[in-house]
Amino acid sequence: MAFTATVFPAEMTKEVFIGAKGHSTIAKLSDQTPIPFSGTDVMTFSFDGEINLVGENAQKGEHTNSNDSVQIRPVKIEYGVRVSDEFVKCAEEKQLEYLQAFKEGFAKKIARGLDIMAMHGVNPATGSPALTLIGTNSFDTNTDVTDITYDASDLEGNLTSAVAAIGDYENTGMAFAPTFALGLAEIKEDGISQYPQFKLGANPGSLNGIPCDVNSTVSAVAGEYAYVGDFKNAFKWGYAEVINFDVIEYGDPDNSGKDLKGYNQVYLRAEAFVGWGILDGAAFARVETSGS
Protein backbone atom coordinates (compact mmCIF):
# COMPACT_ATOMS: atom_id res chain seq x y z
CA MET A 1 0.00 0.00 0.00
CA ALA A 2 1.97 3.02 -1.23
CA PHE A 3 1.42 6.46 0.29
CA THR A 4 2.31 9.89 -1.03
CA ALA A 5 0.39 13.15 -0.84
CA THR A 6 -3.31 12.36 -0.70
CA VAL A 7 -6.51 13.26 1.12
CA PHE A 8 -8.51 11.38 3.70
CA PRO A 9 -11.52 9.60 2.21
CA ALA A 10 -14.75 11.54 2.78
CA GLU A 11 -15.98 9.02 5.33
CA MET A 12 -12.74 9.23 7.31
CA THR A 13 -12.91 13.04 7.28
CA LYS A 14 -16.43 12.80 8.68
CA GLU A 15 -15.22 10.42 11.39
CA VAL A 16 -12.42 12.81 12.35
CA PHE A 17 -14.83 15.69 12.92
CA ILE A 18 -17.37 13.50 14.69
CA GLY A 19 -14.53 12.63 17.05
CA ALA A 20 -13.58 16.28 17.39
CA LYS A 21 -17.13 17.22 18.38
CA GLY A 22 -16.91 14.84 21.32
CA HIS A 23 -13.91 16.68 22.77
CA SER A 24 -14.50 20.32 21.82
CA THR A 25 -16.46 22.62 24.12
CA ILE A 26 -17.17 24.97 21.23
CA ALA A 27 -18.56 22.13 19.11
CA LYS A 28 -20.69 20.80 21.96
CA LEU A 29 -22.31 24.14 22.75
CA SER A 30 -22.77 25.61 19.26
CA ASP A 31 -24.14 24.58 15.88
CA GLN A 32 -22.03 23.53 12.91
CA THR A 33 -22.47 25.01 9.45
CA PRO A 34 -20.83 23.80 6.20
CA ILE A 35 -17.89 25.97 5.14
CA PRO A 36 -16.41 25.97 1.62
CA PHE A 37 -12.72 26.72 1.09
CA SER A 38 -13.65 30.22 0.00
CA GLY A 39 -15.51 30.78 3.27
CA THR A 40 -19.08 31.87 3.81
CA ASP A 41 -21.04 34.92 4.95
CA VAL A 42 -23.67 34.63 7.68
CA MET A 43 -26.35 37.32 7.59
CA THR A 44 -27.29 38.87 10.92
CA PHE A 45 -30.30 41.06 11.64
CA SER A 46 -31.08 43.31 14.57
CA PHE A 47 -34.85 43.52 14.92
CA ASP A 48 -35.74 46.28 17.38
CA GLY A 49 -39.27 46.90 18.60
CA GLU A 50 -42.15 44.50 18.07
CA ILE A 51 -44.32 43.36 15.15
CA ASN A 52 -47.09 45.73 14.15
CA LEU A 53 -50.75 44.72 14.22
CA VAL A 54 -52.32 46.15 11.04
CA GLY A 55 -56.01 46.50 10.31
CA GLU A 56 -57.59 46.46 6.86
CA ASN A 57 -56.63 49.57 4.87
CA ALA A 58 -54.49 50.75 7.81
CA GLN A 59 -51.08 52.34 7.37
CA LYS A 60 -48.04 50.20 8.12
CA GLY A 61 -45.51 51.61 10.59
CA GLU A 62 -41.77 52.08 10.39
CA HIS A 63 -39.48 49.55 12.05
CA THR A 64 -36.01 50.19 13.42
CA ASN A 65 -33.56 47.47 12.49
CA SER A 66 -30.19 46.80 10.98
CA ASN A 67 -28.45 43.98 9.19
CA ASP A 68 -24.90 42.93 8.58
CA SER A 69 -22.90 39.89 7.57
CA VAL A 70 -20.20 38.02 9.45
CA GLN A 71 -17.50 36.34 7.41
CA ILE A 72 -16.47 32.84 8.37
CA ARG A 73 -13.18 32.04 6.68
CA PRO A 74 -11.49 28.68 7.20
CA VAL A 75 -7.96 28.63 8.58
CA LYS A 76 -5.49 25.84 7.93
CA ILE A 77 -4.40 23.74 10.88
CA GLU A 78 -1.82 20.97 10.76
CA TYR A 79 -0.43 18.26 12.99
CA GLY A 80 2.21 15.65 12.35
CA VAL A 81 4.00 12.76 14.03
CA ARG A 82 7.19 10.83 13.40
CA VAL A 83 6.83 7.06 13.20
CA SER A 84 9.14 4.21 12.28
CA ASP A 85 9.78 3.82 8.56
CA GLU A 86 8.35 0.35 8.99
CA PHE A 87 5.06 2.11 8.27
CA VAL A 88 5.78 2.24 4.53
CA LYS A 89 6.96 -1.38 4.47
CA CYS A 90 4.40 -3.17 6.61
CA ALA A 91 1.21 -4.89 5.48
CA GLU A 92 -1.87 -2.86 4.65
CA GLU A 93 -3.67 -4.11 7.76
CA LYS A 94 -0.88 -2.74 9.96
CA GLN A 95 -0.87 0.57 8.09
CA LEU A 96 -4.59 0.89 8.72
CA GLU A 97 -3.93 0.45 12.44
CA TYR A 98 -1.48 3.35 12.28
CA LEU A 99 -4.02 5.47 10.41
CA GLN A 100 -6.81 4.65 12.85
CA ALA A 101 -4.68 5.74 15.79
CA PHE A 102 -3.55 8.86 13.92
CA LYS A 103 -7.14 9.73 12.99
CA GLU A 104 -8.30 9.49 16.60
CA GLY A 105 -5.39 11.56 17.86
CA PHE A 106 -5.84 14.19 15.16
CA ALA A 107 -9.53 14.52 16.04
CA LYS A 108 -8.61 15.36 19.64
CA LYS A 109 -6.04 17.91 18.48
CA ILE A 110 -8.60 19.58 16.22
CA ALA A 111 -11.06 19.75 19.11
CA ARG A 112 -8.56 21.32 21.47
CA GLY A 113 -7.23 23.64 18.78
CA LEU A 114 -10.69 24.90 17.80
CA ASP A 115 -11.45 25.76 21.41
CA ILE A 116 -8.17 27.55 22.02
CA MET A 117 -8.40 29.57 18.81
CA ALA A 118 -12.06 30.55 19.17
CA MET A 119 -11.84 31.28 22.88
CA HIS A 120 -8.45 32.94 23.14
CA GLY A 121 -7.36 34.01 19.65
CA VAL A 122 -3.94 32.38 19.90
CA ASN A 123 -1.96 29.79 17.97
CA PRO A 124 -2.52 26.58 19.97
CA ALA A 125 1.02 25.36 19.29
CA THR A 126 2.79 28.48 20.56
CA GLY A 127 0.28 30.37 22.68
CA SER A 128 1.10 33.53 20.73
CA PRO A 129 -1.70 35.88 19.60
CA ALA A 130 -2.78 35.13 16.02
CA LEU A 131 -3.37 38.75 15.10
CA THR A 132 -3.51 38.20 11.34
CA LEU A 133 -5.36 34.90 11.06
CA ILE A 134 -7.78 35.33 13.99
CA GLY A 135 -7.68 38.96 15.05
CA THR A 136 -10.87 39.86 16.92
CA ASN A 137 -12.63 36.61 16.02
CA SER A 138 -12.32 35.15 19.51
CA PHE A 139 -14.05 35.68 22.83
CA ASP A 140 -10.92 37.13 24.43
CA THR A 141 -10.20 39.59 21.61
CA ASN A 142 -13.74 40.63 20.62
CA THR A 143 -14.32 43.95 22.35
CA ASP A 144 -18.10 43.47 22.42
CA VAL A 145 -17.78 40.47 24.76
CA THR A 146 -18.45 41.58 28.35
CA ASP A 147 -15.68 40.98 30.88
CA ILE A 148 -16.75 39.81 34.34
CA THR A 149 -14.04 39.97 37.00
CA TYR A 150 -13.42 36.57 38.56
CA ASP A 151 -14.19 36.29 42.27
CA ALA A 152 -13.31 32.90 43.75
CA SER A 153 -15.49 33.64 46.77
CA ASP A 154 -18.61 34.34 44.70
CA LEU A 155 -18.73 32.04 41.68
CA GLU A 156 -22.52 32.10 41.62
CA GLY A 157 -22.34 35.89 41.49
CA ASN A 158 -19.89 35.63 38.60
CA LEU A 159 -22.37 33.56 36.61
CA THR A 160 -25.32 35.77 37.54
CA SER A 161 -23.43 38.83 36.33
CA ALA A 162 -22.44 37.06 33.12
CA VAL A 163 -26.02 36.08 32.34
CA ALA A 164 -27.23 39.61 33.08
CA ALA A 165 -24.54 41.04 30.79
CA ILE A 166 -25.87 39.30 27.67
CA GLY A 167 -29.17 41.14 28.01
CA ASP A 168 -31.92 39.90 25.72
CA TYR A 169 -29.78 37.09 24.35
CA GLU A 170 -30.48 33.60 25.62
CA ASN A 171 -27.99 31.77 27.79
CA THR A 172 -27.72 28.54 25.80
CA GLY A 173 -24.36 27.35 27.08
CA MET A 174 -21.56 27.75 29.59
CA ALA A 175 -17.92 26.73 29.37
CA PHE A 176 -16.02 26.24 32.62
CA ALA A 177 -12.35 25.86 33.43
CA PRO A 178 -11.72 22.85 35.73
CA THR A 179 -10.78 25.24 38.55
CA PHE A 180 -14.12 27.04 38.22
CA ALA A 181 -16.07 23.78 38.16
CA LEU A 182 -14.29 22.45 41.25
CA GLY A 183 -15.05 25.75 42.96
CA LEU A 184 -18.74 25.25 42.24
CA ALA A 185 -18.52 21.77 43.75
CA GLU A 186 -17.25 23.28 47.01
CA ILE A 187 -20.17 25.69 47.45
CA LYS A 188 -22.31 24.67 50.41
CA GLU A 189 -25.41 26.04 52.10
CA ASP A 190 -26.23 24.82 55.60
CA GLY A 191 -23.57 22.17 55.06
CA ILE A 192 -25.19 20.85 51.88
CA SER A 193 -23.32 20.89 48.58
CA GLN A 194 -25.19 23.02 46.06
CA TYR A 195 -23.46 21.63 42.97
CA PRO A 196 -22.40 18.07 43.81
CA GLN A 197 -22.51 17.16 40.11
CA PHE A 198 -19.12 18.85 39.69
CA LYS A 199 -17.35 16.93 42.45
CA LEU A 200 -14.22 14.91 41.74
CA GLY A 201 -13.69 16.60 38.40
CA ALA A 202 -16.99 15.43 36.92
CA ASN A 203 -18.37 16.98 33.74
CA PRO A 204 -22.17 16.74 34.11
CA GLY A 205 -23.06 18.36 30.79
CA SER A 206 -25.66 20.75 32.19
CA LEU A 207 -26.26 23.15 35.05
CA ASN A 208 -29.85 23.96 36.01
CA GLY A 209 -30.94 22.62 32.64
CA ILE A 210 -28.47 24.74 30.66
CA PRO A 211 -25.80 22.91 28.64
CA CYS A 212 -22.31 23.31 30.06
CA ASP A 213 -18.91 21.80 29.52
CA VAL A 214 -15.80 21.61 31.67
CA ASN A 215 -12.59 21.77 29.68
CA SER A 216 -8.98 22.76 30.28
CA THR A 217 -9.10 24.68 26.99
CA VAL A 218 -11.04 27.40 28.82
CA SER A 219 -7.99 28.11 30.97
CA ALA A 220 -5.40 27.41 28.27
CA VAL A 221 -4.61 31.10 28.59
CA ALA A 222 -3.98 32.14 32.19
CA GLY A 223 -6.70 34.16 33.86
CA GLU A 224 -9.73 32.77 31.99
CA TYR A 225 -12.34 30.87 33.99
CA ALA A 226 -15.68 30.73 32.18
CA TYR A 227 -17.61 31.75 29.06
CA VAL A 228 -21.37 32.26 29.07
CA GLY A 229 -23.65 33.15 26.21
CA ASP A 230 -25.89 32.39 23.27
CA PHE A 231 -23.73 29.76 21.61
CA LYS A 232 -26.65 28.32 19.66
CA ASN A 233 -27.70 31.51 17.91
CA ALA A 234 -24.72 33.87 17.99
CA PHE A 235 -21.83 31.55 17.15
CA LYS A 236 -21.20 29.26 14.18
CA TRP A 237 -18.37 26.92 13.31
CA GLY A 238 -17.63 24.43 10.57
CA TYR A 239 -15.02 22.73 8.45
CA ALA A 240 -14.13 22.18 4.83
CA GLU A 241 -14.71 18.54 3.95
CA VAL A 242 -11.14 17.81 2.89
CA ILE A 243 -8.23 16.69 5.06
CA ASN A 244 -4.88 16.60 3.30
CA PHE A 245 -2.62 13.75 4.37
CA ASP A 246 1.07 13.31 3.58
CA VAL A 247 3.56 10.56 4.28
CA ILE A 248 6.95 12.25 4.10
CA GLU A 249 10.02 10.04 3.83
CA TYR A 250 12.83 12.57 3.41
CA GLY A 251 14.19 15.67 5.05
CA ASP A 252 13.24 17.42 8.28
CA PRO A 253 9.55 18.35 7.83
CA ASP A 254 8.95 19.36 11.46
CA ASN A 255 12.14 21.45 11.68
CA SER A 256 13.36 19.43 14.64
CA GLY A 257 16.92 19.16 13.32
CA LYS A 258 16.62 15.39 12.85
CA ASP A 259 16.76 14.00 9.32
CA LEU A 260 14.12 11.33 8.76
CA LYS A 261 16.42 8.90 6.98
CA GLY A 262 19.04 9.38 9.65
CA TYR A 263 16.59 8.20 12.28
CA ASN A 264 14.78 5.54 10.20
CA GLN A 265 11.54 7.47 10.40
CA VAL A 266 8.73 8.80 8.22
CA TYR A 267 6.51 11.76 9.00
CA LEU A 268 2.72 11.62 8.94
CA ARG A 269 1.12 15.03 8.51
CA ALA A 270 -2.56 16.00 8.25
CA GLU A 271 -3.96 19.40 7.33
CA ALA A 272 -7.56 20.44 7.92
CA PHE A 273 -9.52 23.64 7.42
CA VAL A 274 -11.81 24.94 10.16
CA GLY A 275 -13.65 28.21 10.56
CA TRP A 276 -15.85 29.96 13.09
CA GLY A 277 -17.62 33.24 13.59
CA ILE A 278 -18.94 35.25 16.52
CA LEU A 279 -22.13 36.74 15.10
CA ASP A 280 -22.46 39.24 17.96
CA GLY A 281 -19.93 39.60 20.76
CA ALA A 282 -22.61 41.21 22.95
CA ALA A 283 -24.22 37.77 23.21
CA PHE A 284 -21.33 36.53 25.35
CA ALA A 285 -19.54 37.24 28.62
CA ARG A 286 -16.31 35.84 29.97
CA VAL A 287 -15.24 35.45 33.58
CA GLU A 288 -11.60 36.42 33.93
CA THR A 289 -9.09 37.95 36.25
CA SER A 290 -8.74 41.66 35.70
CA GLY A 291 -6.31 42.46 32.90
CA SER A 292 -6.00 38.94 31.49
Language-model segments: what does each one mean?
Residues 2-80, 283:
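Assembly/oligomerization interface modules of large self-assembling protein complexes
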Residues 2-6, 10-27, 86-93, 111-118, ...:
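Short, Lys/Arg-rich flexible segments
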Residues 12-25, 98, 102, 106, ...:
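Short, Φ-rich (hydrophobic/aromatic) sequence segments
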Residues 45-48, 84, 177-179, 215, ...:
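Structured loops at beta-to-helix junctions and adjacent beta-edge loops in soluble globular domains
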Residues 52-54, 82-83, 91-92, 183-186, ...:
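Short helix/loop capping segments that flank catalytic or ligand/cofactor-binding pockets
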Residues 84-165, 286-292:
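Alpha-helical scaffold segments that mediate packing/assembly in large oligomeric complexes
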Residues 146-259:
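Extended oligomerization regions of viral-like shell subunits
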Residues 250-292:
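Extended, compositionally biased alpha-helical segments that mediate assembly or anchoring
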